[in-house]
Amino acid sequence: MFDSKVAIVTGAAQGIGQAYAQALAREGASVVVADINADGAAAVAKQIVADGGTAIHVPVDVSDEDSAKAMVDRAVGAFGGIDYLVNNAAIYGGMKLDLLLTVPLDYYKKFMSVNHDGVLVCTRAVYKHMAKRGGGAIVNQSSTAAWLYSNFYGLAKVGVNGLTQQLARELGGMKIRINAIAPGPIDTEATRTVTPAELVKNMVQTIPLSRMGTPEDLVGMCLFLLSDSASWITGQIFNVDGGQIIRS
């Protein structure tokens, strides 16, 4: 599906990002496994290569313009260009996050610089290289928290949705599409570490399909949105959530 294509996946050292990176490699893409956790990214890239795929790892702080540019330069140097970007990097605080009125502002600013601003920073770093290749596609990681929760994790994802829609308007003329996936509760190490078990149980009870999702449940949507099958889709947010959010 993605032979001769190059994809950058941020936050790819574990969990959802790892699943995206491995799936893209299985479909023939050359993958840049990018993460602030350099050792984790290296391990994922090594496994992709062991499985017969093509990958390199790059350390990146998505909130830092110079770091994002270095990531892109490394990708272009290794593979000659960039076709796809998956903005998956995030700080995840689970449901124990403070409300806006009580969160320490220093932490709030750091949190937003990664979960919200990082989407824009990486998109700005990559889009000209996509345009040089005649276009490309970007998938942003949102969350159903944008509609459900009153803390700043949800607020960051509201912002990601807004960025997705505005950037679709700005990038469309360059034949670059951008969409977002909004997962419901996903069973990852991050979720298990920071979300109280009772809250997880309560969330599952609100999901018509009666279970948490897995990273693999999101892979199909990501691959579709990057592929030519989605060539007339941009600026959209797609819930992949077991029915957690059902809207008319």
Swiss-Prot record:
Regions crossing the membrane: none
Gene3D superfamilies: NAD(P)-binding Rossmann-like Domain (3.40.50.720)
One Gene Ontology term, aspect cellular component: plasma membrane
The organism's place on the tree of life at top rank: Bacteria
Residue positions binding substrate: S143
GO MF terms, alphabetically ordered: oxidoreductase activity, acting on the CH-OH group of donors, NAD or NADP as acceptor
Catalytic site: Y153
E.C. number(s) listed in UniProt: 1.-.-.-
GO BP: any one term: fatty acid elongation
Keyword tags: Oxidoreductase
SUPFAM superfamilies: NAD(P)-binding Rossmann-fold domains
Keyword Signal: no
InterPro entries: NAD(P)-bd_dom_sf, SDR_fam
Record bears the keyword Transferase: no
UniProt-annotated binding residues for NADP(+): 8-32
Family the entry assigns: Belongs to the short-chain dehydrogenases/reductases (SDR) family.
Official protein name in the record: Uncharacterized oxidoreductase Rv0769
Organism in which the protein naturally occurs: Mycobacterium tuberculosis (strain ATCC 25618 / H37Rv)
